[in-house]
Each structure stands twice: as C-alpha cells, then as structure tokens.
C-alpha cells in the first residue's frame, strides 16, 4: 500500500462519516432518523419520515460520499484493488460514522456512488436491478440485498479486475442488512412506501 492510497482511504472514511441523513433532517426540522421510523439514517427512512425532497437530498449526498474519493483515487492512478478498498472505506464511514457515534446507515447509496466510476453500464445495471426489485416486491431492503449479491457478477461482466473488492463490499452490505433479513422472515419488514410499524 502506497502512502497516497492510505491517505485516500482515510479521506474516504472521514467523508463517509458525514451523516447526510442526520444533517439534512436537522436542517429541515425533521425527527432524527436514528430514533424515528426504522431508526436507519438513510434515504429510505428519511423518505418515510420527511418525504421526497429530503430523501432526494440525502440520496444525492450519500452517492457523492462514495463517488468523490473513488474518482479521486482513479485520477491519481491508484490500482484497481486499492480503489476497491477506498470504496469500502467510504461505505464503512457511512455505516460506522466517526462523527455520529458510529451509528450509520446500510451503505447502499454510498456503494452505488463508489461503483459509479467503474462505468455507467455497471451503474445502470445496479440501479435497474434495484428499481425492478422494488417495483416487483415493494421492499427497499430486499432490492438492496439482491442488487448487492448480483453486483460482483455485473462487475465481472464489465470490468473483471474490480470483481474482488466489489464482492467484499457486497458482503459488507448484506451483513449490514441482518436485521432486515430477520424482520423479513418474521413478516415484520416494512415496504418502502409504508411507515415503520411501532
């Protein structure tokens, strides 16, 4: 690992640690997403408690948190594997943010942003997979997990040199959804357009 790669990994984690869901909810006078709805500081929960406008801003910021450090590493000619580690670091920052007591989101939007520099074709496949699954099932969490599981295959078809780090990132996202998996099998998981059941 080069010093430059290490610096980018640290920057990615710190950038990921900025919880846009919490900050945007504060700015808009909305409840704290960590204690409201599904208690997840992510775009889906903000959509439930604050509507489209707030959720759209959170989604955009979360995507940029992943995209910017990976783009930076790409232009600095950091090798593909280390770019993957930078992407994982940004997602770890989102999931376990230093600035917000390590209570973060699931990392899906940040992961999408981190994978976007690989190519628009991959981004389109991932986004399309998520949208289709949501439209068919109504579950954002299920769509995220299915998309994460298919991401290594899509990556292998587009740019195989990134497959290993993408697979590592996919495992991280699925593991972060363990509570959703439990609720799904208990019949308690909430669909994207429903408010969280108390």
UniProtKB/Swiss-Prot annotation:
HAMAP family linked to this entry: PlsY
Name by which UniProt lists this protein: Glycerol-3-phosphate acyltransferase
SMART domains assigned: G3P_acyltransf (SM01207)
EC number: 2.3.1.275
Name of the gene this protein is made from: plsY
Transmembrane segments: 4-24, 53-75, 80-102, 112-132, 134-154
Function: Catalyzes the transfer of an acyl group from acyl-phosphate (acyl-PO(4)) to glycerol-3-phosphate (G3P) to form lysophosphatidic acid (LPA). This enzyme utilizes acyl-phosphate as fatty acyl donor, but not acyl-CoA or acyl-ACP.
Organism: Aliivibrio fischeri (strain ATCC 700601 / ES114) (Vibrio fischeri)
Protein family membership: Belongs to the PlsY family.
GO molecular function per UniProt: acyl-phosphate glycerol-3-phosphate acyltransferase activity
Catalytic reaction(s) noted: an acyl phosphate + sn-glycerol 3-phosphate = a 1-acyl-sn-glycero-3-phosphate + phosphate
